[in-house]
């Protein structure tokens, strides 16, 4: 063959370039994604990607880690400052990996856990079919108040006292409002339970002081991914405060328990992102919440059924829309149609949906964190709502709208709230 296997290399590069061109022409509203700054991209593409470093800085099992160690130690300091934690472990390579470490380090098979149900926004790693189940935990779910779109405090307190679980888990993937940590953490402590908070979706909002800080509300351990409202590379983190002697069990579960090398190029990217958030995080997080509220209000004005009207729709980056009145396939119809128009988001189960509706759920989950980072403000949210109305309610040809969306995105290509581009002009 004349070109041998080089044609495969060329095809991969072609797809990479096509993806980057396409993605930069869309309005990306996936609530679990974001875009990294040029500085973070530099770290992620650095020679750290070739290096191994098992164990702790300056106590490695590999030689040649002197620069890696310095970066990781800077990261520990920055994350502790950012979140007010006693320690930050940057080694988990994803949010699920961080959750695995907690479950394997602090519980035993047969222990009871209370988590958020999938339909109520619980993450798959908390489920019997996820990391919690793989650990052999007996998984129970929080009582949920559909009207409040939150955990039912009174019933939850009763459940904790009845079950006496080993661990309770707050946080989730559908997360428009803070969870009642202050109210329920003391009850969990009464029965000797660990209190864990999965901050994957809201880590950047916590860093920017726009959401509850779980470590100040009674949480023992906070886990997170580092690439949603916290706009870093894909990875994970564990933070804890006043945790006591069980730290050693948790750290042993991380290494050698659920990982060896911890993807040092991504670790370096996390550290730069922490510095960005210390510098710009409060303004970034505040604009995210402003944009989310503005988008929710605009969608309601355009005729959509937006969840949480009586609670000002949202206190996070997420906007939840019920589209079951627009089509029998609901979110399973709406999300692919919007993708044809260059508007990217995901279908989502709502609290009243049975699990059997996972492919045709009632809801759409929308996140504004990425479009906020490329400089969009409240007025842009009104334009996005109009694009969505034209596709889903007016039934316009999505390909026609896609061309307008691509033209619209041309003005929003820089990554702001970063040392590379500073703040958007209005800021």
Curated annotation (Swiss-Prot):
Molecular function terms from GO: glycine hydroxymethyltransferase activity; pyridoxal phosphate binding
Required cofactor(s):
pyridoxal 5'-phosphate
The pathway that the record names for this protein is: Amino-acid biosynthesis; glycine biosynthesis; glycine from L-serine: step 1/1
UniProt GO BP? glycine biosynthetic process from serine; tetrahydrofolate interconversion
Give the multimer and partner information: Homodimer.
Q: What does this protein do?
A: Catalyzes the reversible interconversion of serine and glycine with a modified folate serving as the one-carbon carrier. Also exhibits a pteridine-independent aldolase activity toward beta-hydroxyamino acids, producing glycine and aldehydes, via a retro-aldol mechanism.
Q: What is this protein called?
A: Serine hydroxymethyltransferase
Native species: Thermococcus onnurineus (strain NA1)
Quote the gene name from the UniProt entry.
glyA
